[in-house]
A protein has these predicted regions:
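Amphipathic, alpha-helical segments enriched in basic
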Residues: 71, 75-78, 112, 116
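Acidic/polar, glycine-enriched structural segments that form the non-catalytic walls/loops
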Residues: 1-71, 105, 113
Length: 138
């Protein structure tokens, strides 16, 4: 594939994702603002596996992803449990399921008895108050 083909495929994939919500009315500028905000809600949590399904687990060992969900990373719990995750639960429940299963897998692999508040590249950042991951499960 050449660059133009890859660009076209990426445009089509993003348009498919962004069209999960369709709006009417408003100016072109307002629509641009809305869909830019939608795009920002879809950047993370991102896929964490390599092309062969392997990833570094919560125990810092190499694991192969389970085929029942897509292993994801970057859960900034305090920032997203009241906004991004309720929205994604409605428009993309598979993504939310993937992230919650990823947090469970990380806790199981690491032996920790809690879900990470701000998981970053399958590591514990140890910051933020409370445990917003629990609110995302409910």
């Amino acid at each position: 594939k050449n660059f133009g083909q890859v660009k076209q495929e990426a445009t089509e994939l993003w348009n498919k994702e962004l069209n999960r919500v369709r709006i009417s009315g408003g100016t072109d500028d307002e629509k641009t603002i809305f869909y830019t905000a939608m795009y920002h809600t879809m950047i993370d949590p991102r896929i964490y596996t390599d092309v062969d399904g392997r990833y570094v687990g919560g125990d810092y060992k190499i694991h192969t992803a389970d085929s029942t969900f897509t292993k994801r990373t970057i859960f900034s719990g305090w920032d997203v449990f009241r906004s991004q995750f309720p929205l994604q639960t409605i428009i993309n429940p598979r993504l939310v399921s993937d992230e919650l299963n990823s947090l469970i897998t990380m806790a199981d692999q690491s032996g920790r008895e809690y879900y990470e508040r701000w998981e970053l590249l399958n590591s514990y950042s140890g910051c933020m108050l409370g445990n917003p991951a629990l609110s995302s499960y409910v």
